[in-house]
């Protein structure tokens, strides 16, 4: 009898020891999970909820300490709670499948596309754009230039003579941007998008991108050409200056501004104010836009790699991704011809910018595109 009692005592001790070990292991796992979650999401509600549920001395908000203690009284309840909370944490950490869902249902008619050019490029650049992407978006595209051109006006009724100088100077560029801004404000469009005359715009992709944002919010989207904020000096008075640093989207790649943000820019951009603002920092038009938005209004640039300028190596844009880009460009890069590398409907000699080949890739039903083009 004494021997049986000894066996029972030994089994009880072993069982209690195993139970304690299991509790310690689970507690260690829960603490490790808390530390990991804290490293990645220090302020997450799930992490706070986990701490409250697993620490009897810190019950969750709205919870009953007595019930919490009673639930924690058994290993089964403790383990079930740990499993349930871990599942909640994993669900919070998982990316949302709807993150790219449209914020606003818009069409191309909601976008004001401003193309900045100069008269000497009407034939060499604007005729190419008129034959390609503008041909499908005439009503949405407004051409801002410095000289009258009846031939260009016949192709599209949206040619606006800015009365600005034809020089490629800081003042002339800012003069044209000021007119672009004022014309957009006069319109009923939701989005203002600026591009240059060496840009191809995929309007379908542009609309898709802008639909992810609300035009009433403060949205400034584009691509910087610098790898750091630009440093400038703001003239406060004749004898008083201060340094300013800000990001700006390069005009050569194109950028877009929501109407909500554009209206807030009015004190520094409308009428003659834009020219005055540009003179305060003595920088060109696209820099002045960035200064007003980032430095004055405190709105951050949303960077998008879907915009491209001739200041980057365009050979790095793969042909398989051309249809997903918002803007493309061409020109010279490091003293070499800089354009999209692609097999297309036309040879490089026939189509040095590759815009015609890109257009036939996106719109193969274009009348002048070859029927059997190899891509």
Curated annotation (Swiss-Prot):
Lumenal compartment segments: 30-375
Main subcellular location: Golgi
Lineage top rank: taxon: Eukaryota
Cofactor note: Manganese is the most effective. Can also use cobalt with lower efficiency. Has some activity with magnesium and calcium, but not zinc.
Tissue expression from the record: Detected in the neural tube, the eye and the otic vesicle, expression coincides with the region that produces the medial, intermediate and lateral neurons.
EC number of this enzyme: 2.4.1.222
Gene Ontology MF: a single term: metal ion binding
PTM annotation, UniProt: A soluble form may be derived from the membrane form by proteolytic processing.
GO CC, alphabetical: Golgi membrane
Compartment(s) where it occurs, according to its Swiss-Prot or TrEMBL record: Golgi apparatus membrane
Cytoplasmic topological domain residue ranges: 1-8
Keywords, in A-Z order: Developmental protein, Disulfide bond, Glycoprotein, Glycosyltransferase, Golgi apparatus, Manganese, Membrane, Metal-binding, Signal-anchor, Transferase, Transmembrane, Transmembrane helix
Residues the record lists as binding Mn(2+): 198, 310
Protein's membrane topology: Single-pass type II membrane protein
The name this protein goes by in its record: Beta-1,3-N-acetylglucosaminyltransferase lunatic fringe
């Amino acid at each position: 009898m004494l021997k049986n009692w000894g066996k029972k005592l030994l089994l009880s001790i072993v069982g209690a020891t195993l139970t304690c070990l299991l509790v310690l292991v689970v507690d260690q796992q829960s603490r490790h999970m808390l530390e990991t979650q804290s490293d990645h999401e220090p302020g997450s509600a799930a992490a706070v909820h986990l701490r409250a549920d697993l620490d009897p001395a810190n019950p969750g908000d709205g919870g009953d300490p007595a019930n919490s203690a009673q639930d924690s009284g058994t290993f089964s309840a403790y383990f079930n709670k740990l499993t349930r909370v871990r599942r909640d944490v994993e669900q919070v950490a998982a990316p949302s499948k709807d993150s790219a869902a449209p914020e606003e249902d818009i069409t191309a008619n909601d976008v004001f596309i401003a193309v900045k050019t100069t008269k000497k490029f009407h034939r060499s650049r604007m005729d190419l754009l008129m034959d390609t992407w503008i041909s499908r978006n005439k009503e949405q595209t407004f051409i801002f230039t410095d000289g009258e051109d009846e031939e260009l006006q016949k192709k599209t009724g949206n040619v606006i003579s800015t009365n600005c100088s034809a020089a490629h100077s800081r003042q002339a560029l800012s003069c044209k941007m000021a007119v672009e801004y004022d014309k957009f404000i006069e319109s009923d469009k939701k989005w203002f998008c600026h591009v240059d005359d060496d840009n191809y715009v995929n309007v379908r992709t542009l609309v898709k991108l802008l639909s992810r944002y609300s035009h009433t919010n403060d949205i400034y989207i584009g691509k910087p050409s610098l790898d750091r904020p630009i440093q400038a000096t703001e003239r406060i008075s004749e004898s008083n200056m201060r340094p300013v640093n800000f990001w700006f989207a390069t005009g050569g790649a194109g950028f877009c501004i929501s109407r909500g943000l554009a209206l807030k820019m009015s004190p520094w951009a409308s009428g003659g104010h834009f020219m005055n603002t540009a003179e305060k920092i003595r920088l060109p038009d696209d820099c002045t836009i960035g200064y007003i938005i980032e430095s004055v209004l405190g709105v951050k640039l949303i960077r998008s790699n879907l915009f491209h300028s001739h200041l980057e190596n365009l050979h790095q844009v793969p042909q398989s991704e051309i249809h997903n880009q918002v803007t493309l460009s061409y020109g010279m890069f490091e003293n070499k011809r800089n354009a999209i590398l692609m097999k297309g409907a036309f040879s490089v000699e026939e189509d040095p910018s590759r815009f015609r080949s890109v257009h036939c890739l996106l719109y193969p039903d274009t009348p002048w595109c070859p029927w059997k083009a190899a891509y």
